Swiss-Prot record:
Domain of life: Bacteria
Record keyword Cell membrane present: yes
Quaternary data: Could be part of a tripartite efflux system composed of MdtN, MdtO and MdtP.
Residue ranges crossing the lipid bilayer per the database entry: 43-63, 75-95, 100-120, 125-145, 158-178, 402-422, 426-446, 457-477, 483-503
GO MF annotation terms: transmembrane transporter activity
Keywords: Antibiotic resistance, Cell inner membrane, Cell membrane, Membrane, Transmembrane, Transmembrane helix, Transport
Alphabetical list of PANTHER family matching this protein: MULTIDRUG RESISTANCE PROTEIN MDTO, P-HYDROXYBENZOIC ACID EFFLUX PUMP SUBUNIT-RELATED
Protein family: Belongs to the MdtO family.
Protein name in UniProt: Multidrug resistance protein MdtO
Main location: membrane
Length: 683
């Protein structure tokens, strides 16, 4: 700890980031890492034995292809086969009409690249077109490196083998031999979330970061999609299992902030918590067995009062409704998403994005051809790889690519100088490469925030030490050229994406926040009664809120990187946005607490009370996008009926009023603390 205290704050944050990424717990990560690791070693063995070129490309196919579960791996493998056919066909089309004419070759390749980049952003199968764009650009380097058309055709045909045999390999490893099923990962993930919930129910623990809670909720939703596609039993009882996922997400996120020491430590409360934990354990056992949980648990009037006293009644009701739900309830028909985005042909940003990518590639091609430096052709690949929809995400990808390339180049340099002279056979080579590939595979299976570092590190290492050589290599020039090519491509892309039609999310962020707050207002309009339809609707909208707040948080992180914006305006926007996100999360949890008390109120009173909050929040959200929102002020009517029934509800709603008052004033020139207390709120 003392050593960390002496380091600069940015370094400490970077180390904390990598510690979080490398230690991430995710069902299926270990099997995916092992599949990727074994696949890399087999690719090296096969390529070296049969002298198959482009080892780095084969490794890239593995890193992009092996996914977290067997169904997803099979789906990506099919896409890769289709992409290989399309990309080789496009290359032969280009070579046939323009092999000896670089200008004509670029004129033909340009529209192909633009079409692929356009479809990558607008089509559901964007990954296919991304692969075609990569090969279309990479193939332009073949005629420049070789003077014989026959050799170029032979290399292009080798690309079919290079793309398809790793695809076959990952299908055998990840789908047939050692499959990691989505249903197994879902059972493990649900039980892990319930374990965390029980820990917070029984012990006083520090709450986990809200971003982690939201990512876990999104991960469960993604697994649910794979389970629906891959498991027949899950599809048959999908309505119950989707309710189970929503219930577990609600219990996990609610108990994350639960502190048992905040309530009276009476014997009745202790026994009730133990009983609740016992029911959660029964749910865990049913999930492990893959069975729909059915419970005959009922809450007596005294237990209901105890649950209300310790703010656990709503959790009990969600468990009760799940345990009493018919497993054969027919699911709600899901709407089929369109293959193209709605504004694909009306939004000019998509075509501008394709033009910017082509412009960056042409600049790099002109540069490395003009200086006659073929070794830096990776600059063209970099322009395609780091091309992202907006400035912030492009900068993030550039940092990841540069970081991965730097680590890969350092490893390649050390490997060439210190290890290569001592190697005599393929077995020794595989033993030395094993820890490098294992490290790259573990990083590549982390979250999207850092996974590309592992992929780029292994690919750069292979480009410098294993590419097109089938024996010991001591050429340090390859390491230098590959790293410089990536740096040049990164610099060119940064300039193009910053100054040519920059797509800033600074205008989109307030709209995103307004959408999240609008969803929160919908939650407040749901009747706060323990009725099946209302409670299920509440749980599903609540999951949508997790996704909305997480998307806003990620967008804030990208806007921070948009250096083309005025620094003061950017800082003010980020500060206000983060305040809205933080207060929105607090308001959601505070509103949860009112459910434990509001159900005892008369139904005629409740909608009017909840409507005050929803109206105020909707009015505030409508002005966020136009920077015309003031902090909401709410006046609560303290009727004698409400005071007589449940005085604690007034305190809970007053707390919500206080959180409303802390929402930032978007009309002020700078953020200032709220000086006026919200009406109806107490200190």
């Amino acid at each position: 700890m003392s050593a960390l205290n002496s380091l600069p704050l940015p370094v400490v944050r970077l180390l904390a980031f990598f510690h979080e990424e490398l230690s991430e717990r995710r069902p299926g990560r270990v099997p995916q890492t092992m599949q990727l690791w074994v696949g890399c070693l087999l690719v090296i063995l096969i390529s070296m034995t049969f002298e198959i070129p482009f080892v780095a490309l084969s490794l890239a196919v593995l890193f992009y292809g092996i996914q977290s579960n067997a169904f997803y791996t099979k789906f990506v493998a099919i896409l890769f086969v289709v992409a290989t056919v399309l990309e080789i066909a496009s290359l032969f089309l280009i070579y046939k009409w323009s092999y000896g004419e670089p200008l004509i070759r670029l004129i033909i390749a340009g529209p192909i690249l633009m079409s692929c980049m356009f479809l990558m952003r607008t089509h559901r199968l964007g990954l296919v077109f991304f692969a075609v764009a990569i090969v279309a650009i990479y193939g332009q380097t073949f005629p420049a490196m070789l003077d014989y058309p026959e050799a170029v055709v032979r290399l292009t045909l080798w690309c079919i083998v290079v793309g398809l045999y790793p695809t076959l390999l990952m299908t055998l490893i990840g789908v047939l031999w050692f499959p990691s099923r989505a249903i197994t990962q879902m059972h493990q993930a649900l039980n892990d979330r319930l374990d965390d919930a029980i820990s917070h129910l029984t012990d006083s623990l520090a709450p986990l970061p809200e971003t982690r809670i939201e990512r876990e909720a999104l991960a469960l939703q993604k697994l649910n999609v794979f389970c629906l596609a891959d498991d027949a039993n899950w599809r048959t009882q999908s309505a119950w299992w989707q309710s189970c996922v929503a219930t577990v997400t609600y219990i996990y996120s609610t108990l994350n902030r639960y502190d048992p020491t905040s309530f009276a430590d009476s014997q009745a409360i202790i026994e009730f918590r133990q009983k609740l934990a016992s029911e959660i354990n029964k749910l865990q056992h049913s999930i492990t067995e893959g069975q729909c949980w059915q419970s005959d648990w009922r809450i007596s009037e005294s237990e209901a009062m105890t649950a209300r006293e310790c703010n656990l009644e709503n959790i009990c009701q969600t468990l009760l409704q799940l345990g009493q739900m018919d497993p054969n309830t027919p699911p709600t028909p899901a709407a089929k998403p369109p293959s193209m985005v709605a504004d694909a042909f009306t939004n000019p940003d998509y075509m501008r994005y394709a033009v910017k990518t082509l412009l960056a590639c042409l600049i790099c091609y002109t540069f490395y051809s003009g200086v006659d430096w073929e070794g830096i052709h990776t600059c063209m690949l970099t322009c395609v790889i780091v091309a992202n929809p907006n400035v912030g995400s492009s900068y993030q990808k550039m940092v990841l690519r540069f970081g991965g390339a730097f680590c890969g180049a350092i490893l390649a340099l050390l490997f060439t100088l210190l290890v290569m002279p001592w190697l005599d056979n393929i077995v020794e080579l595989l033993f030395v490469l094993a820890p490098i590939f294992l490290l790259g595979a573990w990083i590549a299976t982390s979250s999207e925030r850092s996974s590309y570092i592992g992929t780029q590190m292994v690919v750069t290492f292979a480009l410098a030490t294993l590419e097109n050589v089938f024996g010991p290599v001591y050429d340090l020039v390859e390491i230098r050229d590959r790293a410089l090519g990536i740096i040049i491509g990164t610099v060119v892309s940064a300039v193009i994406y910053t100054f040519v039609w920059p797509e800033s999310e600074a205008r989109t962020l307030p709209q995103k926040l307004a959408g999240a707050l609008g969803m929160l207002s919908k939650v407040m309009r749901i009747p706060r009664q323990q009725e099946v339809t209302a409670l299920r609707t509440y749980l599903h909208i609540r999951i949508g809120l997790h996704a909305a707040f997480n998307a806003c948080e990620e967008m804030c992180q990208r806007v921070v990187l948009e250096r083309q914006l005025d620094s003061e305006e950017r800082a003010l926007l980020i500060e206000r946005s983060q305040t809205v996100i933080r207060q929105g999360r607090d308001i959601l949890h505070a509103w949860d607490a009112t459910w434990n008390s509001a159900q005892a109120l008369d139904n005629a009173l409740q909608p009017d009370r909840a409507g005050q909050f929803a109206d105020a929040l909707e009015k505030y959200a409508a002005g966020v996008a136009t920077a015309l929102s003031h902090s909401p002020q709410i006046t609560l009517e303290e009727t004698s009926a409400s005071q007589a029934i449940l005085p604690t509800l007034l305190k809970q709603e007053q707390h919500v009023c206080q959180l409303f008052a802390r929402l930032p004033d978007w009309t002020a020139p700078a953020l200032t603390p709220a000086t006026e207390q919200a009406q109806g709120a107490t200190q």
